[in-house]
Swiss-Prot record:
Catalyzed reaction equations: tRNA(Tyr) + L-tyrosine + ATP = L-tyrosyl-tRNA(Tyr) + AMP + diphosphate + H(+)
Residue ranges constituting the S4 RNA-binding domain according to the UniProt record: 340-404
Protein name: Tyrosine--tRNA ligase
Binding site for ATP: 231
Chief localisation class: cytoplasm
Length: 406
């Protein structure tokens, strides 16, 4: 049987290891308990987290046991990795709400039945931690000089790094130590932006417990130009259908650049590699077939087959190939709003994130109403605009929404 490491490397997941040869041997010889941490900074996971869950799912399918750690404790501080400013402090109530929402989402991707996976919250051991004890037990193993050389701190030193955030590395390292002691967790997986924190955890376990510990990082989801993927005009591409509709989610993947199709098929689907290679080799207009497969498969994993089919039908209806238009994202508008400016209504309906963005679309010719380009910022929405009680809004080349009179 192939080592899961070969599968992960072939599909492009692995970026860095702490101990590659030992990791390979470990994954071949035993069922390994590993963990990935997720900070509950929002009430939904986004597509950047999805790649981490696919990483976990491949490991679980190979017989290893995942621990999904939700950082209810570390979220009270905020991870400085990749940030140029200090994150806004969240209330305990907000964190608790976000934790509950994320738990529910994770259960769609990872099998937690019969102890096949474990869900933990580091608030359980961090929030009641005695500070002096923590410094004596954990702080003694960390070198400030070494910490300051870490990439996650380097970029913050000039702009100001709070002592609060400086503790984050210790807390994340302590998470690994706790999971190692309680669940015999031997490995941490995470995004490549977490590398410094992960090394700290590996070293803490090895020093404090005299146990072997390992880490490997997953590539971040970037396009062929090196930019992070998963951003839309309305912000992040969320996994929550209330934040990003299944149709909008489907359309995002349907419209990826040709150069990004292979990478997305590898990382975000379970399609066998032979089929990935076949789809990725398509050229010209045929590459659109690969994009349709990508969009359907990713939407099916996140929202289920029924919603993926509805999104596919809506896309086909809008692009002149028949299908069911009822699945296009729809906003119900009261008749009392007739005569209001279109851009105000689009902002209220969250079709555009702001009036400024709406004006930019109009200026660039990227906003249409019932097939006609909107040229006037102050265009009002009148009853005459509604055909059979609805209007069709088009943003850019392929983003559609309906507004119906309630």
């Amino acid at each position: 049987m192939a080592n899961v490491l070969d599968t992960l490397m072939e599909r492009g997941y692995i970026k860095q290891f702490t101990h590659e040869a030992e990791t390979r041997e470990l994954l071949e010889k035993e069922k390994v308990t590993f963990y990935i941490g997720f900070d509950p900074t929002a009430d939904s996971l986004h597509v950047g987290h999805f790649i981490a869950m696919m990483f976990m799912a491949h490991m679980q399918k190979a017989g290893h046991r995942p621990i999904a750690l939700i950082g209810g404790g570390t979220a009270t501080i905020g991870d400085p990795s990749g940030k140029t400013d200090m994150r806004k402090m969240m209330t305990n109530e907000t964190i608790a709400h976000n934790v509950a929402c994320i738990k529910k989402q994770m259960e769609k991707f990872i099998d937690f039945s019969d102890d096949k996976a474990i869900l933990v919250n580091n608030a359980d051991w961090l929030l009641n931690q005695n500070y002096v004890e923590f410094l004596r037990e954990v702080g003694v193993h960390f070198s400030v000089n070494r910490m300051l050389s870490a990439e996650c701190f380097k970029q913050r030193l000039e702009r100001g790094l709070s002592f609060l955030e400086f503790n984050y590395m210790l807390m994340q390292g302590y998470d690994f130590y706790v999971l190692n002691k309680k669940y015999n967790c031997k490995m941490e997986l995470g995004g490549d932006d977490q590398w410094s924190n992960m090394i700290a955890g590996v070293e803490l376990v090895r020093k404090k417990s005299q146990e072997s510990a390992y880490a490997m990082t997953c590539t971040l989801l970037t396009n062929s130009e090196g930019q992070k993927m998963g951003k839309t005009v309305n912000g992040a591409l969320w996994l929550d259908p209330e934040k990003t509709s299944p149709y909008e989610f489907y359309q995002y993947w349907r419209n990826v650049n040709d150069a990004d199709v292979e990478k997305c098929l590898k990382l975000l689907t379970f399609i066998p590699m032979d089929e990935v290679r076949r789809l990725s080799s398509l050229e010209g207009s045929q590459i659109n077939e690969a994009k349709k497969v990508l969009a359907f498969e990713v939407t099916k994993l996140v929202h289920g087959e029924e919603e993926a089919t509805k999104a596919q039908q809506a896309a086909e209806a809008l692009f002149g190939k028949g299908g069911d238009m009822s699945n296009v994202p729809t906003y119900e508008m009261g008749k009392d709003k007739l005569g209001a400016e279109l851009l105000d209504i689009l902002v209220e309906a969250e079709i555009v994130p702001s009036k400024a963005e709406g004006k930019r679309l109009v200026k660039q010719g990227g906003l249409s109403l019932n097939g006609e380009k909107v040229a006037d910022f102050k265009k009002t929405l009148e009853e005459a605009d509604f055909e059979n009680g609805e209007v069709l809004i088009k943003r850019g080349k392929k983003n559609y929404n309906k507004i119906v009179l309630a």
